[in-house]
Amino acid sequence: MKSKKILIVGAGFSGAVIGRQLAEKGHQVHIIDQRDHIGGNSYDARDSETNVMVHVYGPHIFHTDNETVWNYVNKHAEMMPYVNRVKATVNGQVFSLPINLHTINQFFSKTCSPDEARALIAEKGDSTIADPQTFEEQALRFIGKELYEAFFKGYTIKQWGMQPSELPASILKRLPVRFNYDDNYFNHKFQGMPKCGYTQMIKSILNHENIKVDLQREFIVEERTHYDHVFYSGPLDAFYGYQYGRLGYRTLDFKKFTYQGDYQGCAVMNYCSVDVPYTRITEHKYFSPWEQHDGSVCYKEYSRACEENDIPYYPIRQMGEMALLEKYLSLAENETNITFVGRLGTYRYLDMDVTIAEALKTAEVYLNSLTENQPMPVFTVSVR
């Protein structure tokens, strides 16, 4: 097979994994990124004052049920055992999340067994809501007014900048309650943290003789003609110069502060009350429990609407955005020799494991398209 010249826009997980897969098959891969570092939003770095490893763009915990993906990251990093145990400050008390038997008993001042807790939550739920349409209705139906208002209402307003009565029920897909004392935030089979950080992991993925990386480099659409194929992991609307307007995202602001000793005793503390302006405080040294640090680095995290010069984090995907997305998809689907990938390229919220799985699949589809002399699709996943 003749070696192809590949341009990849973005040096996060999507771009790095696709690039590595194609480089290993002998293709010449050029990866560019407008930032001054690799890793996208999973970038981490040592704090100069405390030497704590900081998740610069907010907490990233690796969790998956996909064994192929787990094996892949273990090839490029030593994965340390890590369980994400989130706490929440509500009405002057600290509770465990997700809501579990301990949370229920503490909140209602009871000593329920699992079956008693099930009965209690069923009794609290609003059974008159037969077909919940909104986030609020879904929560009231599932868990009732007290737990909803304590743990979900204020936090959701801060996170999304909207009333829960304006958000779709699908955001709260299933009963967010456990009737045991399990306080592991994730249900996945494989969970961990790269011992030397995500930046080092992605550096390992990019370490191949057929990969060239240029940082602080903007993508110029006209450059496409110099390459056989482009994989674009930047924002879909940006690719088209925002000609129909900007797709809606939430962005995050982080207020960093340092502390001597332990600030909060856990990695993540949610603040559920709408009266507290931030959504959570992250204490970064708790993401690396195998290390010892006297000092501590903390982030207060604030969520707001993403504006022109902000970093887009969470795609909103409400009705208005989906109509706008459709316009951009109608442009994209007429393209040739380009594939839109990743969180920004497909306007979907993706965890790291899904991003890697989709990148592996995309590379496979491209290699197969070459073998079979078929056109490469513009999207390798469903984006609607």
Curated annotation (Swiss-Prot):
FAD binds at S14, D33, Q34, N41, H60, I61, F219, R343, L350, D351, M352, D353, V354, T355. GO terms for cellular component: cytosol. The keyword Acyltransferase does not apply. GO terms for biological process: O antigen biosynthetic process. Pathway: Bacterial outer membrane biogenesis; LPS O-antigen biosynthesis. Residues 1-23 form the signal peptide. Disruption phenotype: Abolishes lipopolysaccharide (LPS) biosynthesis. UDP-alpha-D-galactose binds at N84, F151, T156, W160, Y185, N270, R280, Y314, Y349. This is UDP-galactopyranose mutase. It comes from Klebsiella pneumoniae. The gene is rfbD.
